[in-house]
């Protein structure tokens, strides 16, 4: 059994980041609502508990409290932001509204030599005080320490920015160590779970394969499983893992809706039929999808049509596999958390994969979700450990509706063919161009990024087809052809994103190649919009 950290969620938008930081320390953790029962907390048997932040106020909402069992277990507890405030209130301290609210960067001084912060600092003051650059987001503040607690940190606007009762292993910080803006945040969380809680760092994907395979075999027995294979990371890793466990009991259904990337179908079939020797049913439904999309320009309408048609095609194929008793999905942990499907009595809604909707109920199948405890980065690690090629596992995200939402307006086969080729050229240039010392000196990347490909230095990159024509000149003749926009962003969470400052030479090569190699496009532009105000995808 793995040591476990229990994260109680009070409604913060960044609670998942806490879990990711704990998992990065190779310690297993789960997120659950703050109002779980005392029995649940005891049965979970955590090695430590972390209390998340919240948008709420501790003295206005008296319902948002940690279960009493948290304080009765005798295990270390870390409170973050609101978690610090509810710890203070529940253990006899005082919280009040602050006249000087803090939102953004702050420089915080550590006091005393507590185990949590000792030796962790970003710089020293002239007086020799250790300082940390942290990210604050709070209106309330702890005004009076609970009995047994000592001051651990402060800022000019927040005299009690950290507190600790080291005898009981209780620590609390007003800042957010889980966000990347707090430079030493990962180190702080790692110290809490490894040194203070003493959790074993044995949550490693290579080792997880054996556990997952055993669990799948126990669940499925000798029954058959079907899985909708999209070519995306989640479904591909799920397919590889299930095939490792049950072999020919798995049948993958790969639906080509005519809106895939260049050679994507061949890559998927070569991998799963050729290398893994899995059973794959390949359905070319491009005529059906494109026919229903004819004349449709509204983005949401296009998404609904593509989703509906996928369900129809998949259902028809699934009904041919009469022996199948299970439907496998590539559901991952963020899907479960966001849908309220964590493992408590509140788990009433399990989010279905965007491609299969309510198919488990329609087909009378049981649901198999072997990745539901994993974050995306863990899924990628697992894929590599299973032998999937890195170029498949570390591909940029691709929307479920495919090129259907990267072709503005009406979707036509002609437009999809043009976009496929333009997109492939852009991605090829990103993969083949590495960051240089000159790029780093120009501020386009960090010094540590020199030598990495620009594909790896961007979080998502693609081409967009614009259904407008512009005048151009090629050779001695006038052209009147379509426009494509290139889009590349950098982000840590996809909730916000910066446009990628790519080298001009790279953009120039991509533009020249697209215009010369893709007949029908004569103008290329680069999208320099951030998120917000723009979204990453155009539709």
UniProtKB/Swiss-Prot annotation:
Superkingdom of the source species: Bacteria
Residue intervals of the Glutamine amidotransferase type-1 domain: 4-202
Annotated InterPro entries: Class_I_gatase-like, GATASE, GMP_synth_C, GMP_synth_GATase, GMP_synthase, GMPS_ATP_PPase_dom, NAD/GMP_synthase, Rossmann-like_a/b/a_fold
Pathway of action: Purine metabolism; GMP biosynthesis; GMP from XMP (L-Gln route): step 1/1
Pfam families membership: GATase, GMP_synt_C, NAD_synthase
Boundaries of every GMPS ATP-PPase domain copy: 203-395
SUPFAM superfamilies documented for this protein: Adenine nucleotide alpha hydrolases-like, Class I glutamine amidotransferase-like, GMP synthetase C-terminal dimerisation domain
Active site: 81, 176, 178
Subunit structure comment from the entry: Homodimer.
Listed name of the protein: GMP synthase [glutamine-hydrolyzing]
